[in-house]
Amino acid sequence: IIVGTGTCGIAAGARESLRVLLDELTARGIDADVAEVGCIGMCYNEPLVDVVTDDGEKSTYGHVKVEDVSKIVKEHVIGGQPIEDLLVPQDGFFDRQVRVVLENCGIIDPESIDEYMSKGGYKALKTALTEMSRQQVIDKITASGLRGRGGAGFPTGVKWGFVAREPGPEK
């Protein structure tokens, strides 16, 4: 069971729904994996709760109120029957989206460095620190086209090149 607890979910009441969910599972003696994830990407449907079955079938519930939680546990988690009137319609919202930077958003716990690393997080940093020279890093950043966010969009690799050529240990 996945509960979106990004700022949008929290503002919509996700923490309360999560608390009631955990209490409900405990009271019924259900040993389910419950994960908190960052924003799932449908802020307008928060709080969002995904129920994923053992065979990988995912049902997404939207606008989950505290009073809906018991019904979701009883009918879906225990009974195996999704509650149609609480499900988020499959309208193709995500179909044409390609997530790059935020590909794991709504999938992993944003407060778990281990989950981030299990998805390849910090791999590029490790490579830069252990396998590349300073100039190779600058060349890679330059080739990427990465630009600053200060308004002018100045090329980051060019800036790093300027700084690297300056004398002295502090940059």
Question: Predicted segment positions?
Answer:
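Feature of Fe-S/electron-transfer and energy-metabolism proteins
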Residues: 1-171
